[in-house]
Amino acid sequence: MDTTGLRERAEAWRKADPDPETQAELANVLAKSDWADLADRFAQDLEFGTAGLRGVLGAGPNRMNRAVVRRTTAGLARYLKATVPDVTTRGVVVGRDARRLSKELAEDTAAVFIAEGIPAHVFPEPVPTPVTAFAVLHLNAAAAVMVTASHNPPEYNGYKVYWGNGAQIVPPQDVGIADAIAKVEPANEVPLLTPAQGRAKGLWRDLPEDVGHAYLRAILDLRLYRKGSDTLSLVYTAMHGVGGAWAALALKEAGFPRVTPVAEQQQPDGRFPTVRFPNPEEPGAMDLSIATAERVKADVVLANDPDADRLAVMARDASGKLRLLTGNEVGVLLGHYVLTQGTKRARPHVVTTIVSSTQLGEIARGLDAAYDEVLTGFKWIANRALERTAKEGTQFVFGYEEALGYTVGTATRDKDGVGAALVVADMASWCQARGTTVLGYLEEIQRRFGLHVGAQRNVTLPGAAGAQTIRAIMQAFRASPPANIGGTPVTAVRDYEKGEGGLPPSNVVAFVLEGGGRVTLRPSGTEPKIKYYFEHKETPAPGEPLPQARQRAEAKLAALIDAFLVLARDRGQPA
């Protein structure tokens, strides 16, 4: 290791760092001559992609910090001025969550934009990510930045970019912005204006509460049943994030007086003190919600993640036990509900991803709706909806991805956990009026369209050796795809690296199985993992109790997973 060169780079970066806190942090690392830590901090520049930036807070170019955000914003601002002629008129929205350093990073973002002559429409308080996405369209802004790391652990933060169409950026915008960032001067040389200077010039514009009110009106308009319920008991958790006040107001306005918040998690707290990971999918994250629900005998539990763009749902089964629904089950419920109970449209359009359940497609075909599968990430859902509306006149009504992301209608062009919570409550009250439950409604759908069960397995492979192993796994399955998995014939192989189905090339391989099942594998885009997605379809026998059919389906799914992992091991790859 060239420690002399590493020290020189670190000293130069520290001198250009505008933040005394990270200056001191890096000085301490240098004083200890912790070369491994320094090598990691300076291994690369934190990569800017379609998801923007996300990383651990700390000093150095491979961390999230004020220096990185100032340079990133300068590059984004200059790219906008080069590609969006009216950006200095329309401006850019700046929002933030309640994580550590989010306020400072958002203020730096706005300060750089206004120094570049671009008006900054700034949320003065933390807001849900979907509110920032909504504001782009509501204000006709040229773009938006949301400072958030969503459901990552507390040591993370991030920087999410939306374009003027209200959707997250897609290629080639990410490459163009990254190229512009690479040309930016050191952070301490990036021009800034203070909020007072910006307000005096009319460039720093604090957003009024009217924008939030408009968002609430828009999501309240998503309801289909619209009658609320005095008797439906709901529990809601904000998971220490920013959704609490927004969800409470929306549910109250929608006619749901019996909403019990999880008190320990209702207020924003970037430390996330009651959970190991602030992600409703993680084991233990829902424990306080379950305890609250049992105490008040709740019918349904609604859980947002910290930036309120995702939603987890729990509901009671026939025995009265609370069950956590999968993202696919919630997606199927909402998709069917919107297509059957919503305003009848000439060409309704629903969209999901290539790693989500295929059941939404079966429902769409059965109900004569347009349907698409796109790559993972809500940016692809939003952009496909826009494309088909422009080319074919379809009307987008619903989109989802299995990782607890949903959007109903076109109020926002990103996943919206608050809006989805409101529509789930609306659906639950409709079910109650029909004499059934959320899970009873799911059984109705499964009897008509089949019982789909799914699971995901992640294999963590850290470091350079792990990255090489992941590449080898993908290459091996491409070079020699299995003829069957656990005795079930593979009827088709879909290699998305070749632009399968007209999609942009992506490092994903799927094996379609006889009977409607599927196994899909892809490397994670943000973590050192390879992800395996499994789906099995079972057709219940006439009159067969659904729990019995589900038990059989789960057993077959488990056998499919075991067979695939054995296949991976037999080929010499870890699983």
Predicted segments with their positions:
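Short acidic, glycine/serine/threonine-rich loops at helix termini
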Residues: 103-108, 133-137, 155-161, 182, ...
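N-terminal small/polar loop signature for handling phosphorylated ligands or for N-terminal nucleophile
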Residues: 93-156, 250-313
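Long hydrophobic segments that form regular secondary structure
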Residues: 219, 229-251, 255-257, 286, ...
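Gly/Ser/Thr-enriched, mixed-charge loops and adjacent short helices
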Residues: 13, 17, 21, 37-46, ...
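An N-terminal, well-structured beta->alpha segment
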Residues: 8-109, 204-232, 242
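Conserved phosphate/anionic-ligand binding catalytic regions in large, soluble enzymes, centered on
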Residues: 42-62, 149-152, 238-246, 250, ...
